[in-house]
Amino acid sequence: MIHFLEQHFVELVTITSIIYLTLATILLLYQTPDTAVYKTFRRSKRLMAGGMMLISLNIWIWIASFTGSWTEYNNWVPCFDIILFYLMGICFSFSLSSLLDPHYISRKRCRTIAVKFTMTAFFALIAMTDALKAYQIPLLLIALIGLLEMLIGHIYYFNKCYLRSNALFENYFSNEKSHFIRWLKVSHWLFYGMLILGVISIRTGALFNWLVQFYVVGMNLYILVNIINYASEYETLMKADCDKTEEEKSGEASPKKAYIETLRPRVTEWIQEKSYLKDQFTIDDLATRLYTNKTYLSSFIKEEFGMSFSSWIASLRLEEAKKMMSEHPDAKLKDIAYNVGFSSLPYFSSVFAKSEGVTPSVWMKERGRNAER
C-alpha cells in the first residue's frame, strides 16, 4: 500500500493543485453587489483566492524538486515553504479578519507585515546559499520563528475582531447573529491546522502527505462554500459596524438623568404593546420608534436592565414564551418560538436553557407535573 501511495502521489498533488486553482477562479469570478459596503468583501475574496493560488504554487514547486525518492530531500524546499507559508498566512488571515472588521487592513499593519516578511524571507533565502550551508538549520529556525510570530499575532487580532463583532451584533440586532460568523472562526483554525500539517509533512512519508492533501482540499471547499453563503448576509451584518463607527465619530455621551426619565415611560409603553414580538428589528428601528438615538437607547438599556440590546429583547420574549407555554401546554414549541419573535427553535431552546437551566420541553413537563399535584 505504501508503495502505491508513493508511486501515485505526484498524480494526486497535480489533481489537487488544479482543484485549488479552480476554487480560486470560482472565487474571483463570483459576483457581489458593486456597492461601497461590499468593497471589503471583494478584497477579502481576492485575498482568499490568492491564498489558494499560493497553495497550488507550493505544490508545483514541490513537484519540480521531487526526485522520485522519499528518502532524499532538497534542502532549499523548506526555505521556499517558509516563504510561501508566510504569504499564505497573510492572505488567509487578512481575508478572514477583514470580513469581521472592514478596517483591519490598514496602511500601518501592511507596512509592519511587509517589514517582518522581508526579514523572514531574507533568513530563509540566505539559508539556501552554499557559503552559509553550515548555518542552514539555525537560519531556517530564525525564519520559522518569524513565521510563528506572524501567526500568533494574527490569532490574537482575529480573536479580538471576532469578540468585537459578537458584541456589536448583541447591541444592534434583536435576534442572535453570531452563527453567521462562526464559520470564520472554524476556517481560521482549519487554516492554522493546515500550516502545522504542512511543516510536519516536509519530513514525513507518502501516507501522511496523502492525508494532508485531503485535509487541505476539504478546508478550501469549506471556505469557498461559506464565503459565498456569507455574501448574502454581509451587508446586513455590516450595518452594526457602520453604526458603531458613526457613534465613535460623533462621540455622543450617555444620556443624562433627565433624559432617562423621559425615555423610561416610552420604553415601558413599547413593552406593554409587546412590539418586541416582531421577528427581526435593530436597535436603530427601536430608537426611531421611541424618538431617540441608538447611543442613548443602548446606554439606557445597559443602565436600566444591565444587559445588551439582544439579551434584553430575548428576556422579554422568554417571559412571553413561558406565559404561552403555561396557558397552552399542548402547543408546539416551534410555533411558540416563532410567535414570540425567535428566528428558529434551536435558538429559542438555547436561550431558554441558558436562562432557565433546562430546555423548554423539560420546563413544560415539570410545569405539567406540578399542575397535577
Task: Locate the predicted segments by residue.
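Alpha-helical transmembrane segments and their membrane-interface junctions
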Residues: 62-75, 192-209
